[in-house]
């Protein structure tokens, strides 16, 4: 029997990470804690960069934008998940699903682009230190962030609009804790060739493109560091990009891990569990990575809490 084609659907069902009732309180507490830590940590980074004039530099300007993107990124998925657990409902409206998917794609792409921009900033700082302030002027920094927003927004809108053209069947269960683009497309009854091509193109543009840029920047950075004669000079140069390199590694490794897990198991629930790493863990860990070894951030936060300028 052929599935019924329904173009006037009103809602989807999010199956979540687990269907076990006894696990729901634990999941609620765990993800609420992770969400609050993520929002608070990234807000502190933004507060530090705004309040301390010494941090009004391109590196911290990009970092504050990344923190804002991380707050928005995690806020597109976790609050709805917590509401569903608390109300014991798995339903999300059609409009809500499309909106969630749109913003998830937007801020996921923005994260990737901002990491590439930050890699370029570190490249200029280490490879062209004498011309750093001239090259990384406020106008260029603003344009780089604006371009990142525009590219991510155009991709998000195009992906979402293509989903709106799809027809869906009676099986509207999404084996995930949020409306993930690939999962939603696979529920469609109509032809998804254009959607699949759009996803692959976007993956190449917003994942492959920034990754190539980051690798090129760091290849130049490594060459410059190797040319430095003193060990102290090498350590100082490397320490300026160590935090960014850690965040990039975390972002890429978790994303690759989710992809490999999905390809190896073909189990949607396993994929959903693995995706927690890049949707929740990465935004949560970023503030800790940037602040633990960053004396400037620590000093700015101490001054903010003490009420000093």
UniProtKB/Swiss-Prot annotation:
Record-level GO cellular component terms: plasma membrane
Organism whose genome encodes this protein: Homo sapiens
Top-level taxon of origin: Eukaryota
Protein name from the UniProt record: Olfactory receptor 7A17
Cell compartment(s), UniProt: Cell membrane
MF term (GO), any: G protein-coupled receptor activity
A single GO BP: signal transduction
Glycosylation sites: 5
Cytoplasmic topological intervals: 47-54, 121-139, 218-237, 293-309
Role summary: Odorant receptor.
Keywords, in A-Z order: Cell membrane, Disulfide bond, G-protein coupled receptor, Glycoprotein, Membrane, Olfaction, Receptor, Sensory transduction, Transducer, Transmembrane, Transmembrane helix
Family designation: Belongs to the G-protein coupled receptor 1 family.
GN (gene name): OR7A17
SUPFAM superfamilies: Family A G protein-coupled receptor-like
Entry's transmembrane regions: 26-46, 55-75, 100-120, 140-160, 198-217, 238-258, 272-292
